Regions:
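Carbohydrate-interacting regions of secretory-pathway proteins
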Residues: 1-126
Length: 126
């Protein structure tokens, strides 16, 4: 399958649909250049920081590591760090509107009903 589009939401508000920091799962880049990923490429923090490069490919399992430590959020794909971001916005219970350091739920997303995204071997550490 091509154009798989999904995400992993962290620090989401319990009971609120997909409302947290979203780490993207989308294997696209400009003109086939992995050093020019689209803004929402795999590992990117949606609407906050683009992935530095595209490391993963469609139809291949990959490992994504997400760290959320205070205002610091970062991600690695197959061991390559692709984001490193400090949320310096004013605190807000809603992470779409400001810094949220409170724990929340983790949500897995397939972008729409036609999207097929699979997750396996999920490990959560505190």
């Amino acid at each position: 399958m091509r154009n798989r589009n999904g995400g992993v939401f962290v620090r989401s508000i319990a009971g609120d649909f997909m409302n947290g920091y979203e780490f993207q799962v989308y294997n696209r880049c400009h003109d086939g250049d992995v050093n020019r990923p689209v803004f929402w490429a795999t590992g990117a923090i949606d609407d906050r920081q683009n992935a530095r490069r595209l490391v993963s490919r469609d139809n291949e399992w990959f490992r994504m590591t997400i760290v959320a430590n205070g205002p610091h959020l970062a991600s690695w794909v197959n061991g390559v760090q692709v984001t490193d971001w400090i949320d310096d916005r004013k605190p807000n219970v809603n992470p779409r509107n400001g810094l949220r350091v409170e724990p929340g739920v983790i949500q897995l997303q397939a972008h729409d009903p036609a999207t097929e995204v699979e997750f396996r071997r999920i490990v959560i550490q505190k």
